[in-house]
Amino acid sequence: MNPMRKNIAEMAGYVPGFQPRDEQNYTKLNTNENPYPPSPKVIEAILAEVGDNLRKYPDAASRAGCEEAGRLYGFDPDWVIMANGSDEVLNNLIRAFAGEGEEIAYVHPSYSYYSTLAEIQGAKVRTFLLDEGWALKDFPERYTGKLFFLTNPNAPLGFCYPQEFIEELAGRVDGMLVVDEAYADFAKENSLDLVRRLPNVVVTRTFSKSYSLAGMRLGLAIAHPEVIAALNKIRDHYNLDRLAQTACVAALADQEYFQQCVSKIRETRDWFSAELRVLDWDVIPSHGNFVFATPPDRNGKRVYDALFERRILVRYFSDPVLSHGLRISVGTREEMEKTLAALADIG
Protein backbone atom coordinates (compact mmCIF):
# COMPACT_ATOMS: atom_id res chain seq x y z
CA MET A 1 0.00 0.00 0.00
CA ASN A 2 1.35 3.43 -0.95
CA PRO A 3 0.67 5.86 1.93
CA MET A 4 1.24 8.90 -0.29
CA ARG A 5 -1.75 11.16 -0.92
CA LYS A 6 -3.33 10.23 -4.24
CA ASN A 7 -3.32 13.78 -5.61
CA ILE A 8 0.41 14.15 -4.88
CA ALA A 9 1.27 10.83 -6.48
CA GLU A 10 -0.63 11.76 -9.64
CA MET A 11 0.37 15.40 -10.08
CA ALA A 12 3.13 16.41 -12.48
CA GLY A 13 4.52 19.36 -10.53
CA TYR A 14 5.65 22.76 -11.80
CA VAL A 15 8.54 22.97 -14.27
CA PRO A 16 10.56 26.20 -13.84
CA GLY A 17 12.70 27.79 -16.51
CA PHE A 18 16.01 26.13 -17.38
CA GLN A 19 18.82 27.12 -15.01
CA PRO A 20 22.21 26.18 -16.49
CA ARG A 21 24.92 25.27 -13.99
CA ASP A 22 27.49 27.10 -16.12
CA GLU A 23 25.30 30.18 -16.48
CA GLN A 24 28.25 32.46 -17.22
CA ASN A 25 28.50 30.77 -20.63
CA TYR A 26 24.94 31.70 -21.61
CA THR A 27 23.00 34.83 -22.42
CA LYS A 28 20.20 34.14 -19.97
CA LEU A 29 16.89 35.69 -20.97
CA ASN A 30 14.49 32.94 -19.89
CA THR A 31 13.46 33.57 -16.27
CA ASN A 32 12.83 37.34 -16.10
CA GLU A 33 15.72 38.04 -13.77
CA ASN A 34 16.99 41.60 -13.44
CA PRO A 35 20.15 42.14 -15.55
CA TYR A 36 21.54 44.61 -13.01
CA PRO A 37 22.98 43.79 -9.58
CA PRO A 38 21.16 44.60 -6.34
CA SER A 39 21.64 48.02 -4.82
CA PRO A 40 25.16 48.47 -3.39
CA LYS A 41 23.42 49.38 -0.13
CA VAL A 42 21.81 45.92 -0.09
CA ILE A 43 25.19 44.22 -0.49
CA GLU A 44 26.66 46.44 2.22
CA ALA A 45 23.81 45.65 4.62
CA ILE A 46 24.07 41.89 4.01
CA LEU A 47 27.82 41.88 4.62
CA ALA A 48 27.32 43.85 7.83
CA GLU A 49 24.83 41.22 9.05
CA VAL A 50 27.15 38.28 8.34
CA GLY A 51 28.84 37.26 11.56
CA ASP A 52 27.79 36.49 15.10
CA ASN A 53 24.14 37.41 14.44
CA LEU A 54 23.71 34.34 12.25
CA ARG A 55 23.67 32.09 15.31
CA LYS A 56 20.40 33.77 16.37
CA TYR A 57 16.93 33.16 14.97
CA PRO A 58 15.53 35.97 12.82
CA ASP A 59 12.54 38.11 13.75
CA ALA A 60 9.63 35.72 13.18
CA ALA A 61 7.31 38.53 12.03
CA SER A 62 9.84 40.33 9.79
CA ARG A 63 8.65 43.54 11.43
CA ALA A 64 11.31 45.82 9.95
CA GLY A 65 10.38 44.71 6.44
CA CYS A 66 6.65 45.16 7.08
CA GLU A 67 7.29 48.64 8.46
CA GLU A 68 9.51 49.67 5.54
CA ALA A 69 7.03 48.33 2.96
CA GLY A 70 4.17 50.01 4.79
CA ARG A 71 6.03 53.32 4.78
CA LEU A 72 6.80 53.04 1.07
CA TYR A 73 3.30 52.01 -0.05
CA GLY A 74 1.26 53.96 2.52
CA PHE A 75 -0.08 51.17 4.76
CA ASP A 76 0.14 50.36 8.44
CA PRO A 77 2.46 47.37 9.05
CA ASP A 78 -0.45 45.10 9.99
CA TRP A 79 -1.57 45.30 6.34
CA VAL A 80 1.72 43.71 5.19
CA ILE A 81 3.23 40.23 5.37
CA MET A 82 6.75 39.35 4.22
CA ALA A 83 7.36 36.04 2.49
CA ASN A 84 10.00 33.65 1.22
CA GLY A 85 9.25 34.76 -2.33
CA SER A 86 5.75 35.76 -3.43
CA ASP A 87 5.17 32.06 -4.20
CA GLU A 88 4.97 31.44 -0.45
CA VAL A 89 2.14 33.96 -0.16
CA LEU A 90 0.31 32.42 -3.12
CA ASN A 91 0.63 29.00 -1.51
CA ASN A 92 -0.58 30.22 1.87
CA LEU A 93 -3.55 32.04 0.35
CA ILE A 94 -4.73 28.74 -1.11
CA ARG A 95 -4.05 26.95 2.19
CA ALA A 96 -6.03 29.61 4.09
CA PHE A 97 -9.02 29.96 1.78
CA ALA A 98 -9.43 26.85 -0.39
CA GLY A 99 -10.01 23.51 1.27
CA GLU A 100 -10.03 20.12 -0.40
CA GLY A 101 -12.60 20.06 -3.19
CA GLU A 102 -13.15 23.82 -3.15
CA GLU A 103 -12.41 25.89 -6.24
CA ILE A 104 -9.81 28.44 -7.24
CA ALA A 105 -9.55 30.02 -10.68
CA TYR A 106 -7.14 32.00 -12.80
CA VAL A 107 -6.67 33.39 -16.28
CA HIS A 108 -5.07 31.22 -18.94
CA PRO A 109 -2.45 31.92 -20.05
CA SER A 110 -0.82 33.31 -16.93
CA TYR A 111 1.20 31.86 -14.05
CA SER A 112 0.55 28.10 -14.17
CA TYR A 113 2.01 27.61 -10.68
CA TYR A 114 -1.41 28.55 -9.26
CA SER A 115 -2.68 25.22 -10.57
CA THR A 116 0.19 23.29 -8.98
CA LEU A 117 -0.42 24.91 -5.59
CA ALA A 118 -4.11 24.09 -5.80
CA GLU A 119 -3.36 20.47 -6.69
CA ILE A 120 -1.18 20.14 -3.59
CA GLN A 121 -4.08 21.38 -1.47
CA GLY A 122 -6.58 19.10 -3.22
CA ALA A 123 -8.54 22.10 -4.48
CA LYS A 124 -10.31 22.23 -7.82
CA VAL A 125 -8.95 24.46 -10.58
CA ARG A 126 -10.91 26.43 -13.15
CA THR A 127 -9.35 28.52 -15.91
CA PHE A 128 -10.78 31.35 -17.98
CA LEU A 129 -9.42 31.91 -21.46
CA LEU A 130 -8.78 35.28 -23.07
CA ASP A 131 -10.38 36.63 -26.21
CA GLU A 132 -8.48 38.67 -28.79
CA GLY A 133 -8.97 41.85 -26.76
CA TRP A 134 -7.67 40.20 -23.55
CA ALA A 135 -11.15 40.09 -22.00
CA LEU A 136 -12.15 36.98 -20.01
CA LYS A 137 -14.25 34.51 -21.96
CA ASP A 138 -17.41 33.15 -20.32
CA PHE A 139 -16.75 34.78 -16.94
CA PRO A 140 -19.92 34.50 -14.82
CA GLU A 141 -21.82 37.44 -13.40
CA ARG A 142 -20.84 36.06 -9.97
CA TYR A 143 -17.79 33.90 -9.42
CA THR A 144 -18.44 31.81 -6.32
CA GLY A 145 -15.06 30.10 -5.96
CA LYS A 146 -12.76 30.79 -3.04
CA LEU A 147 -9.93 32.58 -4.87
CA PHE A 148 -9.43 34.20 -8.25
CA PHE A 149 -5.84 34.91 -9.31
CA LEU A 150 -5.18 37.73 -11.77
CA THR A 151 -1.60 38.26 -12.92
CA ASN A 152 -1.23 41.95 -13.73
CA PRO A 153 0.77 42.71 -15.80
CA ASN A 154 0.00 39.38 -17.39
CA ALA A 155 2.82 36.90 -17.60
CA PRO A 156 3.86 35.63 -20.07
CA LEU A 157 2.05 38.00 -22.43
CA GLY A 158 2.90 41.34 -20.80
CA PHE A 159 -0.35 43.28 -21.29
CA CYS A 160 -1.95 45.18 -18.41
CA TYR A 161 -5.57 45.24 -17.24
CA PRO A 162 -6.93 48.72 -16.41
CA GLN A 163 -7.75 49.32 -12.76
CA GLU A 164 -11.41 49.94 -13.64
CA PHE A 165 -11.67 46.37 -14.93
CA ILE A 166 -9.98 44.95 -11.82
CA GLU A 167 -12.33 46.88 -9.53
CA GLU A 168 -15.34 45.58 -11.46
CA LEU A 169 -13.91 42.05 -11.29
CA ALA A 170 -13.49 42.33 -7.51
CA GLY A 171 -17.18 43.13 -7.26
CA ARG A 172 -18.06 39.95 -9.16
CA VAL A 173 -15.84 37.65 -7.07
CA ASP A 174 -17.48 36.31 -3.91
CA GLY A 175 -14.15 35.12 -2.51
CA MET A 176 -10.73 36.76 -2.64
CA LEU A 177 -9.32 38.46 -5.72
CA VAL A 178 -5.53 38.04 -5.67
CA VAL A 179 -3.75 40.50 -7.95
CA ASP A 180 -0.31 39.04 -8.59
CA GLU A 181 1.81 42.12 -9.27
CA ALA A 182 5.16 40.43 -9.78
CA TYR A 183 5.85 42.82 -12.67
CA ALA A 184 3.89 45.90 -11.57
CA ASP A 185 7.01 47.99 -10.93
CA PHE A 186 7.60 48.02 -14.70
CA ALA A 187 4.03 49.20 -15.41
CA LYS A 188 2.34 52.56 -14.92
CA GLU A 189 -0.43 51.44 -12.56
CA ASN A 190 -1.02 49.07 -9.66
CA SER A 191 -3.92 47.89 -7.50
CA LEU A 192 -2.78 49.10 -4.09
CA ASP A 193 -5.59 51.64 -3.90
CA LEU A 194 -8.11 48.83 -4.41
CA VAL A 195 -6.69 47.04 -1.36
CA ARG A 196 -7.48 50.11 0.74
CA ARG A 197 -11.08 50.21 -0.45
CA LEU A 198 -12.04 46.58 -1.07
CA PRO A 199 -11.55 43.97 1.68
CA ASN A 200 -11.51 41.03 -0.76
CA VAL A 201 -8.50 42.29 -2.77
CA VAL A 202 -4.96 41.05 -2.06
CA VAL A 203 -1.87 42.34 -3.86
CA THR A 204 1.29 40.23 -3.98
CA ARG A 205 4.74 41.47 -4.95
CA THR A 206 8.18 39.92 -5.47
CA PHE A 207 11.71 41.24 -5.03
CA SER A 208 12.99 38.89 -7.74
CA LYS A 209 12.34 41.18 -10.71
CA SER A 210 12.61 44.90 -10.02
CA TYR A 211 14.85 44.61 -6.93
CA SER A 212 17.36 42.10 -8.39
CA LEU A 213 16.94 39.67 -5.49
CA ALA A 214 15.72 36.46 -7.15
CA GLY A 215 18.50 34.56 -5.39
CA MET A 216 17.30 35.63 -1.92
CA ARG A 217 13.62 34.60 -2.27
CA LEU A 218 11.76 37.66 -1.03
CA GLY A 219 8.15 38.64 -1.52
CA LEU A 220 5.25 40.31 0.24
CA ALA A 221 1.50 40.69 0.27
CA ILE A 222 -0.66 43.67 1.13
CA ALA A 223 -4.21 43.01 2.27
CA HIS A 224 -6.79 43.80 4.92
CA PRO A 225 -5.38 43.07 8.41
CA GLU A 226 -7.80 40.15 8.91
CA VAL A 227 -6.35 38.46 5.83
CA ILE A 228 -2.78 39.18 6.95
CA ALA A 229 -3.56 37.75 10.40
CA ALA A 230 -4.81 34.53 8.79
CA LEU A 231 -1.67 34.24 6.65
CA ASN A 232 0.51 34.79 9.70
CA LYS A 233 -1.15 31.82 11.40
CA ILE A 234 -0.06 29.36 8.71
CA ARG A 235 3.27 30.66 7.38
CA ASP A 236 6.52 29.06 8.52
CA HIS A 237 7.33 30.75 11.80
CA TYR A 238 10.84 31.76 10.67
CA ASN A 239 10.07 32.09 6.97
CA LEU A 240 12.68 34.80 6.26
CA ASP A 241 16.26 34.41 7.42
CA ARG A 242 18.26 37.30 8.84
CA LEU A 243 20.07 38.06 5.57
CA ALA A 244 16.83 38.15 3.59
CA GLN A 245 15.20 40.49 6.10
CA THR A 246 18.24 42.75 6.00
CA ALA A 247 18.23 42.78 2.19
CA CYS A 248 14.51 43.52 2.12
CA VAL A 249 14.77 46.67 4.23
CA ALA A 250 17.85 47.96 2.41
CA ALA A 251 16.30 47.34 -1.03
CA LEU A 252 13.05 49.12 -0.20
CA ALA A 253 14.93 52.04 1.33
CA ASP A 254 17.09 52.68 -1.75
CA GLN A 255 14.41 53.91 -4.11
CA GLU A 256 16.84 56.01 -6.14
CA TYR A 257 18.79 52.94 -7.29
CA PHE A 258 15.54 51.00 -7.78
CA GLN A 259 14.11 53.68 -10.08
CA GLN A 260 17.34 53.85 -12.10
CA CYS A 261 17.24 50.10 -12.81
CA VAL A 262 13.53 50.07 -13.63
CA SER A 263 13.94 53.01 -16.01
CA LYS A 264 16.79 51.31 -17.87
CA ILE A 265 14.80 48.09 -18.24
CA ARG A 266 11.72 49.93 -19.53
CA GLU A 267 13.84 51.84 -22.04
CA THR A 268 15.57 48.68 -23.27
CA ARG A 269 12.23 46.81 -23.42
CA ASP A 270 10.62 49.45 -25.64
CA TRP A 271 13.68 49.71 -27.90
CA PHE A 272 13.92 45.92 -28.25
CA SER A 273 10.20 45.66 -29.06
CA ALA A 274 10.57 48.22 -31.83
CA GLU A 275 13.57 46.38 -33.27
CA LEU A 276 11.67 43.08 -33.27
CA ARG A 277 8.91 44.72 -35.30
CA VAL A 278 11.53 45.77 -37.86
CA LEU A 279 12.26 42.03 -38.22
CA ASP A 280 8.52 41.47 -38.88
CA TRP A 281 7.87 39.88 -35.49
CA ASP A 282 4.44 40.35 -33.91
CA VAL A 283 5.09 41.96 -30.52
CA ILE A 284 2.58 42.40 -27.69
CA PRO A 285 3.15 45.79 -25.99
CA SER A 286 4.72 44.84 -22.66
CA HIS A 287 4.37 46.32 -19.20
CA GLY A 288 6.82 43.83 -17.64
CA ASN A 289 10.55 43.16 -17.84
CA PHE A 290 10.04 40.79 -20.77
CA VAL A 291 8.53 40.72 -24.24
CA PHE A 292 6.25 38.08 -25.73
CA ALA A 293 6.74 38.03 -29.49
CA THR A 294 5.93 35.80 -32.44
CA PRO A 295 8.28 35.22 -35.40
CA PRO A 296 6.97 35.67 -38.95
CA ASP A 297 6.50 31.91 -39.49
CA ARG A 298 4.77 31.54 -36.07
CA ASN A 299 7.14 28.69 -35.15
CA GLY A 300 8.39 29.55 -31.68
CA LYS A 301 10.06 26.18 -31.15
CA ARG A 302 12.22 26.54 -34.27
CA VAL A 303 13.58 29.89 -33.12
CA TYR A 304 13.97 28.69 -29.52
CA ASP A 305 16.12 25.75 -30.65
CA ALA A 306 18.24 27.95 -32.90
CA LEU A 307 18.86 30.43 -30.07
CA PHE A 308 19.69 27.59 -27.69
CA GLU A 309 22.36 26.38 -30.10
CA ARG A 310 23.86 29.86 -29.85
CA ARG A 311 23.67 29.63 -26.02
CA ILE A 312 20.97 32.28 -25.82
CA LEU A 313 18.21 31.17 -23.45
CA VAL A 314 14.63 32.38 -23.87
CA ARG A 315 11.34 30.83 -22.72
CA TYR A 316 9.29 28.61 -25.01
CA PHE A 317 5.90 27.27 -23.92
CA SER A 318 4.55 24.13 -25.57
CA ASP A 319 0.99 25.10 -24.63
CA PRO A 320 -0.94 25.51 -27.93
CA VAL A 321 -2.10 28.96 -26.81
CA LEU A 322 1.54 30.12 -26.60
CA SER A 323 3.63 27.83 -28.80
CA HIS A 324 3.67 30.28 -31.71
CA GLY A 325 5.87 32.71 -29.79
CA LEU A 326 8.64 33.24 -27.26
CA ARG A 327 8.92 35.13 -24.00
CA ILE A 328 12.21 37.01 -23.97
CA SER A 329 13.44 38.61 -20.75
CA VAL A 330 14.88 42.11 -20.99
CA GLY A 331 18.61 42.02 -20.35
CA THR A 332 21.25 44.68 -20.78
CA ARG A 333 21.38 46.65 -24.03
CA GLU A 334 24.39 44.54 -25.08
CA GLU A 335 22.54 41.27 -24.42
CA MET A 336 19.54 42.41 -26.41
CA GLU A 337 21.71 43.58 -29.32
CA LYS A 338 23.32 40.13 -29.37
CA THR A 339 19.89 38.50 -29.35
CA LEU A 340 18.62 40.70 -32.18
CA ALA A 341 21.66 39.86 -34.29
CA ALA A 342 21.02 36.15 -33.69
CA LEU A 343 17.34 36.49 -34.60
CA ALA A 344 18.20 38.33 -37.80
CA ASP A 345 20.61 35.52 -38.69
CA ILE A 346 18.10 32.78 -37.83
CA GLY A 347 15.38 34.42 -39.89
UniProtKB/Swiss-Prot annotation:
<dbReference type="GO" id="GO:0004400">
    <property type="term" value="F:histidinol-phosphate transaminase activity"/>
</dbReference>
<dbReference type="InterPro" id="IPR005861">
    <property type="entry name" value="HisP_aminotrans"/>
</dbReference>
<feature type="modified residue" description="N6-(pyridoxal phosphate)lysine">
    <location>
        <position position="209"/>
    </location>
</feature>
<dbReference type="Pfam" id="PF00155">
    <property type="entry name" value="Aminotran_1_2"/>
</dbReference>
<dbReference type="InterPro" id="IPR004839">
    <property type="entry name" value="Aminotransferase_I/II_large"/>
</dbReference>
<dbReference type="InterPro" id="IPR015424">
    <property type="entry name" value="PyrdxlP-dep_Trfase"/>
</dbReference>
<keyword id="KW-0663">Pyridoxal phosphate</keyword>
<dbReference type="InterPro" id="IPR015421">
    <property type="entry name" value="PyrdxlP-dep_Trfase_major"/>
</dbReference>
<comment type="pathway">
    <text>Amino-acid biosynthesis; L-histidine biosynthesis; L-histidine from 5-phospho-alpha-D-ribose 1-diphosphate: step 7/9.</text>
</comment>
<dbReference type="InterPro" id="IPR050106">
    <property type="entry name" value="HistidinolP_aminotransfase"/>
</dbReference>
<dbReference type="InterPro" id="IPR015422">
    <property type="entry name" value="PyrdxlP-dep_Trfase_small"/>
</dbReference>
<keyword id="KW-0368">Histidine biosynthesis</keyword>
<keyword id="KW-0808">Transferase</keyword>
<dbReference type="GO" id="GO:0000105">
    <property type="term" value="P:L-histidine biosynthetic process"/>
</dbReference>
<protein>
    <recommendedName>
        <fullName>Histidinol-phosphate aminotransferase</fullName>
        <ecNumber>2.6.1.9</ecNumber>
    </recommendedName>
</protein>
<dbReference type="GO" id="GO:0030170">
    <property type="term" value="F:pyridoxal phosphate binding"/>
</dbReference>
<keyword id="KW-0028">Amino-acid biosynthesis</keyword>
<comment type="subunit">
    <text>Homodimer.</text>
</comment>
<dbReference type="InterPro" id="IPR001917">
    <property type="entry name" value="Aminotrans_II_pyridoxalP_BS"/>
</dbReference>
<keyword id="KW-0032">Aminotransferase</keyword>
<comment type="similarity">
    <text>Belongs to the class-II pyridoxal-phosphate-dependent aminotransferase family. Histidinol-phosphate aminotransferase subfamily.</text>
</comment>
